[in-house]
């Protein structure tokens, strides 16, 4: 995309500074205690009360208004069509790079949405569960392409979303273990008539144009609202290295960890390994497959160097 094309695309968004966005919060304090915020934090990022009040409270209110609009439209159409069609879940998609903090954003939105009027049932699903199992990736020579579009069972993900939006009472999703770096064969996430479903993953806004047999429908077609969590690559790389070092001292120490072989790396070796993985896999995926999708989002959250959201862009 040229600079002119990018500028034109960004004109489709209303831009808010953090201060401007924070003003949309009409004096409401976050309904989360300090302990609850701590439980929602990632392993290397904190969630301040100011971050919740300034950024996520207005976002939560916006999402609630969008959901209420959908409900009213559904009821109006039922009256017009003289049908009693079942109400289906409000689906929110959250995309962004590895290590950008999208999982924390997803958990925060889940916590706030569950406190909306009526206490809706809110489920969070990650697309990691729709990665092909390691044995399949190894057979296809794709282990070093894990996270790239071809490493996902997109058909299964689309089937899951189709069932969800068809109002199927019970929908199941596979689960993924970041410890074993593989699908958990003995665990399934079961969603029973949820009101809101958050689908989080690096690939949720991607448009797969490769392969004649791929369906002409995309994951994002099922979203009622989509969010892209953005940041400068140098900052994301810094966070990735920090996360790698923390995991080296914690999860990697466990014998069952896929990355157990990295447990004894020195600080210098850990940094070098994290940088190598980034520049050969995650950084390449970000540049080619993830970042180009941000302009497909309804809202972009742009973070600064300290995980603090500095700018919000909302599609007009």
Swiss-Prot record:
Its main location: cytoplasm. It is found in: Cytoplasm. Its EC number is 2.7.1.33. ATP binds at residues 96-103. Keywords: ATP-binding, Coenzyme A biosynthesis, Cytoplasm, Kinase, Nucleotide-binding, Transferase. InterPro entries: P-loop_NTPase (IPR027417), PanK (IPR004566), PRK/URK (IPR006083). Pathway: Cofactor biosynthesis; coenzyme A biosynthesis; CoA from (R)-pantothenate: step 1/5. GO terms for cellular component: cytoplasm. GO terms for biological process: coenzyme A biosynthetic process. GO terms for molecular function: ATP binding; pantothenate kinase activity. It catalyses: (R)-pantothenate + ATP = (R)-4'-phosphopantothenate + ADP + H(+). It holds the Pfam family PRK. Belongs to the prokaryotic pantothenate kinase family. NCBIfam families: panK_bact (TIGR00554). This is Pantothenate kinase. It comes from Shouchella clausii (strain KSM-K16).
């Amino acid at each position: 995309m040229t600079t002119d094309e990018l500028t034109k695309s960004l004109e489709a968004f209303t831009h808010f500074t953090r201060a401007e966005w924070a003003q949309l919060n009409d004096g409401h304090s976050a309904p989360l205690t300090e302990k609850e915020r701590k439980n929602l934090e990632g392993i290397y990022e904190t969630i301040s009360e100011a971050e919740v009040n300034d950024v996520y409270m207005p976002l939560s209110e916006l999402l609630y208004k969008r959901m209420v609009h959908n409900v009213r439209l559904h009821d109006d159409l039922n009256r017009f069509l003289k049908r009693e069609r079942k109400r289906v879940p409000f689906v929110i998609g959250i995309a962004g790079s590895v290590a950008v903090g999208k999982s924390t954003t997803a958990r925060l939105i889940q916590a706030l949405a569950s406190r909306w009027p009526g206490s809706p049932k809110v489920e969070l699903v990650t697309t990691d569960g729709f990665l092909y199992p390691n044995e399949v990736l190894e057979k296809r020579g794709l282990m070093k392409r894990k996270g790239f579009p071809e490493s996902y069972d997109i058909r299964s993900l689309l089937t899951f979303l189709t069932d969800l939006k068809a109002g199927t009472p019970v929908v199941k999703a596979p689960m993924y273990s970041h410890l074993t770096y593989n699908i958990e064969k003995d665990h399934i996430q079961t969603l029973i008539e949820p009101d809101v479903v958050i689908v989080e993953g690096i690939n949720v806004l991607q448009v797969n144009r490769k392969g004649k047999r791929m369906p002409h429908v995309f994951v994002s077609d099922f979203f009622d609202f989509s969010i892209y969590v953005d940041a400068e690559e140098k900052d994301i790389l810094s966070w990735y290295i920090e996360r790698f070092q923390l995991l080296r001292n914690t999860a990697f120490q466990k014998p069952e960890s896929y990355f157990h072989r990295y447990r004894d790396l020195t600080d210098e070796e850990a940094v070098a390994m994290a940088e190598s993985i980034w520049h050969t896999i995650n950084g390449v995926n970000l540049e080619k497959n993830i970042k180009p999708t941000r302009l497909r989002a309804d809202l972009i959250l742009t973070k600064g160097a300290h995980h603090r959201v500095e700018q919000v862009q909302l599609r007009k």
